[in-house]
């Protein structure tokens, strides 16, 4: 039945076991997540997607962040999360999910960030709060800069790029790749989560 609804909506797809492989057209980027597809199906099944799933009373985060490139990033926000005690076993619940999507398992915060990206269609990036200062910025740079990536590689960024800088050093190639210096690990208990819309 769901397959028929997808065809009615113009979504070409194939079914393998219980997995829908979607063939989305370039103009339907809003459907590049589970939430986006459910939103398309909602009228057929009278599903209400308007309920809030977040805590409205959030304490303001004191962060000395400056956006020097509003033309390249129109909206950006940060949320700090601290976990007390041990992180419960969670990978069993995400094991098949990650396997089906060919996602590598890393650490708790990175795994949850990847999960949210596929579920909600909103990429996020996690910084280990103990490895980043309160003073960093988003800037467009044009000079060559060295960058130590999450993949343990040191590269030279050339040309015009949108980057997050801390003390003049690149800590994140915006929307592309995070840096090793502020990355999360299995020992991370406090993170700053970046959620941005890059134009």
Can you describe what each PLM-predicted range is?
Residues 1-199:
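RNA/tRNA-interacting regions in translation and RNA-turnover enzymes
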């Amino acid at each position: 039945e769901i397959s028929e609804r997808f065809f009615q909506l113009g979504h070409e797809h194939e079914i393998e076991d219980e997995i829908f492989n979607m063939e989305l057209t370039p103009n339907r980027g809003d459907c590049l997540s589970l939430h986006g597809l459910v939103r398309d199906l909602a009228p057929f099944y009278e599903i209400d997607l308007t309920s809030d799933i977040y805590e409205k009373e959030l304490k303001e985060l004191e962060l000395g962040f400056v956006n020097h490139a509003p033309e390249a990033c129109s909206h950006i926000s940060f949320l700090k999360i601290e976990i007390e005690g041990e992180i419960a076993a969670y990978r069993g619940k995400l094991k098949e999910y990650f396997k089906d999507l060919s996602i590598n398992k890393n650490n708790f915060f990175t795994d949850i960030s990847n999960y949210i990206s596929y579920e909600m269609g909103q990429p996020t990036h996690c910084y280990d709060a103990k490895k980043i200062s309160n003073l960093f910025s988003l800037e467009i740079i044009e000079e060559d800069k060295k960058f130590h990536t999450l993949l343990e590689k040191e590269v030279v960024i050339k040309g015009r790029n949108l980057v997050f800088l801390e003390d003049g050093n690149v800590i994140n190639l915006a929307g592309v790749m995070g840096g090793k210096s502020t990355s999360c690990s299995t020992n991370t208990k406090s993170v700053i989560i970046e959620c941005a819309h890059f134009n």
